[in-house]
């Protein structure tokens, strides 16, 4: 009997575009979905799957769903972490799990961070609208510059460090905080280590680059957002759980902060009536931080490699520990 492989959430139509599936399709039936599936529609789609390919953590795979997939033999996900996958439930059924490599996603996310900073700081959406409405410059075209401003980085890993280097090139001061930050580590990239409260009080732009965990959930709540300058901008290309979304919406609507650029959301795709769609001075992107051709080339080729090995009865490639 031919195996059935289901590929979920290929929004970008990238799998077949960026890799060769001919050997897999010769040995198995493959169905690729480019729109999200939910509830009974998702269950009906997955019921006959022998192998399942997940794009990051776009579709949750909890134990309650896994228990209903009696034919499931193998799971592959892109990237190296999947917070929406119940790995324990799969391992309990001895279903192997593979993952791909990342590719240059940190470069992509750092670039997007700066695109959002500059887009919001220079009010590029509003300036573009002037021209599409047959207008020219107005009072909102008198724009600030970055030199001499302070960038606050919450987290200074590989992405945060890249963002810091660009800020210094613009002549900005960089301050940073994380639970394990040391003055020496901050100094190594030309930044100053401060407390979280000091960072929020001092920064003209605050950008999040910290790992999501139980201790960082809701890190920026109503109390913390109230510490920010009234014209300060908040940038989040990390994880939505780091910020209390309701508190952010209130802060934007009440104009207690200057604006926000957001790439990550509590539920994705973003629902049509989400309040962030209507908040002032808000720039939204559809979770593009890791969405770059070199990254997806690594994803798709890794998936093909894993599936070919599985179909040929070879040892699992890049098994999840």
Residue ranges and their predicted role:
Residues 2, 72, 147-150, 222, ...:
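Phosphate-coordination loops involved in phosphoryl transfer and adenosine-cofactor binding
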Residues 98, 231-321:
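Rossmann-like dinucleotide-binding domain for NAD(H)/NADP(H)
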Residues 44-47, 60-65, 179-275:
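Rossmann-like adenosine-cofactor binding region
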Residues 1-51, 55-56, 171, 184, ...:
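N-terminal glycine-/charge-rich "phosphate-binding" loop or analogous flexible N-terminal tail
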Residues 104, 128-162, 171:
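Glycine-rich NAD(P)-binding loop of Rossmann-like domains
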Residues 48-128, 143:
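Phosphate/diphosphate ligand-binding glycine-rich loop within oxidoreductases
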Residues 110-129, 165-172, 302-309, 314:
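Oxidoreductase and adenylate-handling cofactor-binding alpha/beta cores
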Residues 11-13, 34-38, 56-60, 79-82, ...:
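Short beta->alpha connector loops
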């Amino acid at each position: 009997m031919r195996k059935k492989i289901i590929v979920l959430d290929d929004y970008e139509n990238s799998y077949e575009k960026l890799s060769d599936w001919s050997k897999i399709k010769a040995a198995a039936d493959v169905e690729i979905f480019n729109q999200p599936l939910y509830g009974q529609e998702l269950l009906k789609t997955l019921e006959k799957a022998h192998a399942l390919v997940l794009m990051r953590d776009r579709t949750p795979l909890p134990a309650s769903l896994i228990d209903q997939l009696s034919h499931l033999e193998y799971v592959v996900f892109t990237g190296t972490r999947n917070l929406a996958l119940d790995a324990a439930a799969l391992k309990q059924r001895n279903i192997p799990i593979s993952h791909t490599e990342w590719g240059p996603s940190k470069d992509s996310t750092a670039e997007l961070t700066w695109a959002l900073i500059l887009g919001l700081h220079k009010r590029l959406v509003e300036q573009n609208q002037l021209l599409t409405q047959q207008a020219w410059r107005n009072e909102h075209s008198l724009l600030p510059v970055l030199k001499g401003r302070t960038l606050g980085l919450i987290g200074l890993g590989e992405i945060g460090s890249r963002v810091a280097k660009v800020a210094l090139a613009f002549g900005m001061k960089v301050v940073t905080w994380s639970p394990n930050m040391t003055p020496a580590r901050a100094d190594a990239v030309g930044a100053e280590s401060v407390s979280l409260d000091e960072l929020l009080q001092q920064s003209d732009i605050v950008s999040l680059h910290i790992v999501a965990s139980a201790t960082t959930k809701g890190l920026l709540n109503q109390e913390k957002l109230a510490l920010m300058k009234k014209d300060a901008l908040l940038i989040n290309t990390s994880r939505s759980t780091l910020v209390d979304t309701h508190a952010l919406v209130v802060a934007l609507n009440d104009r207690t902060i200057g604006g926000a650029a957001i790439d990550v959301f509590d539920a994705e795709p973003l629902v049509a009536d989400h309040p962030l769609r209507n908040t002032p001075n808000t720039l939204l992107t559809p979770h593009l931080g890791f969405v770059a051709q070199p990254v997806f080339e690594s994803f798709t080729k890794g998936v093909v490699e894993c599936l070919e090995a599985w179909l040929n009865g070879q040892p699992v490639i890049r098994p999840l520990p």
